[in-house]
């Protein structure tokens, strides 16, 4: 979970419009989220208790949570603890070690960042690579799911020479639509460009045998 799990555009927020909102309180939105994710949480809990592994690698919070003034960092940590999840704030590094029979087959570094601000999605993804070294960069703030695979140079000690490696940049997306029936909502009023993205997944695959990382959505 990369943040903005909850909408939290509540009364008092300049974007709030009563006719456009079905769930008006934190409790209602939290209950809806828990209900939709119940099956996933049960599977995650089973993996943790029986195999010591996390099905859900992490949960972050996004601007919809940390700017809401109704959810604190303590609330997020407590919620994650209750559900056997790891809370990673808004930015974090993850070190992935894929093993087979106790032997390390592939190690990759992931930089996960909820994201902030507006602008073009590709530029936002490229900005993640500034001052941060990783193999996979993931964000979710912008309402435009997309993925990019590219090569980057590095010095390979095993070859004692320069080399190149793959990098994956993914905006897993916060799904939205800028049009609603019978109500003129905030996203229709804010500008000329309408946004829409359907719910779905963006998949990153790690092939330890071929030492390849790929993405598709």
What feature does the model see in each segment?
Residues 84-90, 96-106, 110, 174:
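Active-site-proximal loop/helix segment associated with metal-binding centers of metalloenzymes
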Residues 46-54, 105, 161-165:
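Short helix-terminating capping/connector loops at secondary-structure junctions
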């Amino acid at each position: 979970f990369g943040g903005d799990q909850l909408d939290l555009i509540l009364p008092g927020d300049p974007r709030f419009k009563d006719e456009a909102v079905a769930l008006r309180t934190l409790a209602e939105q939290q209950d809806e989220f828990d209900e939709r994710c119940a099956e996933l949480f049960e599977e995650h809990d089973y993996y943790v208790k029986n195999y010591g592994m996390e099905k859900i690698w992490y949960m972050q919070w996004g601007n919809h949570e940390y700017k809401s003034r109704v959810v604190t960092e303590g609330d997020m940590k407590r919620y994650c603890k209750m559900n056997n999840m790891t809370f990673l704030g808004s930015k974090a590094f993850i070190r992935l070690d894929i093993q087979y029979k106790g032997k390390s087959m592939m190690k990759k570094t992931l930089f996960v960042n909820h994201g902030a601000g507006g602008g073009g999605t590709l530029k936002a993804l490229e900005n993640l690579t500034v001052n941060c070294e990783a193999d996979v960069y993931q964000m979710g703030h912008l309402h435009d799911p997309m993925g990019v695979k590219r090569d980057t140079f590095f010095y390979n000690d095993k070859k004692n020479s320069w080399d190149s490696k793959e990098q994956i940049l993914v905006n897993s997306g916060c799904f939205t639509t800028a049009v609603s029936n019978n109500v003129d909502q905030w996203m229709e009023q804010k500008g000329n460009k309408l946004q829409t993205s359907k719910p779905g997944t963006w998949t990153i695959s790690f092939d330890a045998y071929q030492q390849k990382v790929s993405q598709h959505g």
